[in-house]
Amino acid sequence: MHESSQQQLNPVWDGVNRGFGKRVVNIMAKRIIQFGTSRFLQAHADLFVHEARETGQDIGPITIIKTTRGRERDERVAAFGSPAGYPVIIRGRISNVTIEDQLTVKSVEKALMVERDWSELRTLFAYDAEIIFSNVGESGYTLQNGDRIDAPISFPAILLSLLHARFEAGGKRLLILPCELVSENGKVLRKILVKLAEEWKLGKTFGEWLETKIVICDTLVDRIVSEAIDPVGAIAEPYALWAIKREPTYDIPFIHPAVVVTDDLEPYLRLKLHILNLGHSFLAEIWLTEKRPHDETVREILSDVEIKTRLLELYDKEVLPGFAAHGLANAASQY
């Protein structure tokens, strides 16, 4: 679970090898509450927890929370409660070998709705939760004018209200792992919570508890989850990464090949931005300017030898030298 070499900048997990880690005895499960029902988390964090549980690690189960109001995704919420689990299909290529493997994820116990199940959620959060996941999108950090501690609307307000309930119930420590694609997402979320706590006048003692007992890590997630499966499930590419910035006061309580705990997220961020995202932007520009077929996929556009050559030349001449200058040549080439 620690970063020990440059090679670990690119943990390639094929979604098939479940033989990682030593099997351990499950003594007391670490219950997780997850805000967000997205297909991304279904094929990312939720799948990782399932894999860890398969080796006997004491992590989970997960209770998923639908924070948005309205009836959309109600069918998905109900489906999360099936003991049969849900499918995740890992489809793509590893080392020039095409793979397609279907897994059944059973780490999710149930799903709740904030507007319907607030009392149950409040009790679960106050007394039983040990870890929080979230993926509510960039706009999910935006506060709402009507937010109140007794009637929160936005995700940060919901989270702060639940944290206050936990504080009043005895205030056990808690680990929060935000998965939103926001730079320094942990720091950003903490800043919002602290400011809102001041506005709500929750008091100095609560503020100190929030600072010392609630661990919020910066994280970076990476995986292409191309398609949802109705009512619940997803299709994803083989490559996956969850880079978590190390907190000296709290160990990440499970291991998985795609999870890396590091003192520095910057190299992972640069690889994602300047190789993966740059490549997508480059291809999108070609697709637009050359008026290529509207339904063309990435695989199809890269089957054009001339375009693939242009992309590889961009990487070789303009991207890889920059990484090499910072001692990341091997990591960038593998990525």
Residue ranges, per PLM feature:
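Substrate/ligand-engaging "lid" and interaction regions
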Residues: S5, L9-Y335
